[in-house]
């Protein structure tokens, strides 16, 4: 289910016209892409479910790298990403979404006027019936 979630999440984010300012949205950090780019930095899953439905709890960290020398320069884009992730439709190929929860974020300045932001979410998924 973890790989199904990763694929669905990337496709969902890439399909949003409000995120058209992002040069590439990839499953992993792109090897050579001009910022801004968005990728899955990491994911991990554990067993989760209910009495009658098996599932997984999956944590996904998304990384946005952008060019800006302002601390809040990428804030509007991060807000759009957050809203889009939380709006992921519940019925997907390979799983049914039970819940999404924002866990934490980190932001840092990097060399050459680059900024990086990490957004971490918890997804609880049911296996398909």
Predicted regions and their residues:
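Short, charged interaction patches at domain edges and termini
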Residues: 1-11, 44-57, 93-129
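Small/polar-rich, solvent-exposed N-terminal microdomains that initiate assembly or binding
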Residues: 1-52, 83, 88-92
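Preference for bulky hydrophobic residues occupying beta-strand positions
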Residues: 40, 62-64, 121-123
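Active-site-adjacent structural patch at catalytic or cofactor/ligand-binding sites
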Residues: 56-66
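Mid-chain, well-packed structural core segment of small domains
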Residues: 65-90
């Amino acid at each position: 289910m973890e790989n199904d979630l990763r694929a669905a999440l990337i496709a969902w984010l890439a399909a949003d016209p409000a995120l058209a300012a992002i040069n590439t949205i990839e499953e992993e950090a792109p090897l050579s892409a001009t910022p801004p780019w968005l990728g899955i930095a990491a994911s991990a899953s554990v067993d989760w479910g209910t009495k009658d439905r098996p599932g997984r709890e999956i944590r996904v960290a998304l990384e946005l790298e952008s060019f800006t020398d302002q601390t809040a320069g990428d804030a509007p884009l991060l807000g759009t990403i957050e809203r889009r992730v939380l709006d992921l439709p519940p019925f997907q190929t390979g799983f049914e979404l039970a819940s999404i929860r924002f866990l934490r974020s980190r932001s840092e300045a990097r060399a050459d006027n680059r900024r990086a932001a990490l957004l971490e979410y918890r997804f609880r998924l049911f296996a398909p019936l």
